[in-house]
Amino acid sequence: MVVVANAQELSGQDNPEVQRVEPFQVFDNLYYVGGKWVAAWLLETDQGLILFDSLYGDLTDLVIDGIRELGFDPDDVRYIIITHAHYDHIGGARRFQEEFGSVV
């Protein structure tokens, strides 16, 4: 018998329960809202919130939940800055656009 598995599936990279990290304040107005293997950062400004990267798929829920756990409202995410064009960093951007009106 031959078993072929996707290494990403085996590692739990797509599983929000495995990837969950308690969101935390890094310093001043910068917060971590990402997962264990891919980062997302939230910057609080006078103009609203700026999110750096949005994760993807179910992991985008980690970002949204983290924003709420820190006492912020995802509706206040005005801008999303994508650090680079890998799917794990950009996949949730459309969701933020559609649900919260964020500008990418």
Predicted segment positions?
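Intrinsically disordered, low-complexity N-terminal regions enriched in serine/proline/glycine
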Residues: 5, 30-31, 78
